[in-house]
């Protein structure tokens, strides 16, 4: 399992620990990933995704999982999230016809 958010694409960053004497040692900054179950109102399904903690509040602010994933750019979404987005779009167009 990669250390990457499936909705925002945020991954591991690299930097330095810097001591008081200015010695620098390499370190990793890992995202605060959580396994969250999102419910889609359009498809009436539940989807479990690995997302960072900031993304959870972004989804709520956008008006829910469906609104967030429909606005999201396909380049940052994981392949699993792109498949969910495609399913939501297909269901939405089928309901509107």
From Swiss-Prot:
InterPro entries, sorted: Ribosomal_bL28, Ribosomal_bL28/bL31-like_sf, Ribosomal_bL28_bact-type, Ribosomal_bL28_sf
Membership in a protein family: Belongs to the bacterial ribosomal protein bL28 family.
Alphabetically ordered keywords of this record: Ribonucleoprotein, Ribosomal protein
Protein name: Large ribosomal subunit protein bL28
Pfam family, any one: Ribosomal_L28
Keyword check for Translocase: no
Domain of life: Bacteria
Keyword field contains Ribonucleoprotein: yes
GO molecular function: structural constituent of ribosome
NCBIfam families in the cross-refs: L28 (TIGR00009)
A GO term from the CC aspect: ribonucleoprotein complex
Annotated coiled-coil segments of the chain: none
GO biological process assignments: translation
């Amino acid at each position: 399992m990669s250390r990457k958010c499936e909705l925002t694409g945020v991954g591991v960053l690299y930097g330095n620990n810097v001591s008081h004497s200015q010695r620098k040692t390499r370190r990793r900054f890992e995202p605060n990933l959580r396994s969250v179950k999102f419910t889609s109102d359009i498809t009436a399904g539940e989807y479990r995704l690995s997302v960072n903690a900031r993304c959870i509040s972004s989804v709520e602010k956008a008006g829910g999982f469906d609104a967030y994933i429909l606005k999201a750019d396909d380049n940052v979404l994981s392949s699993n999230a792109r498949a969910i987005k495609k399913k939501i779009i297909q269901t939405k167009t089928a309901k509107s016809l």
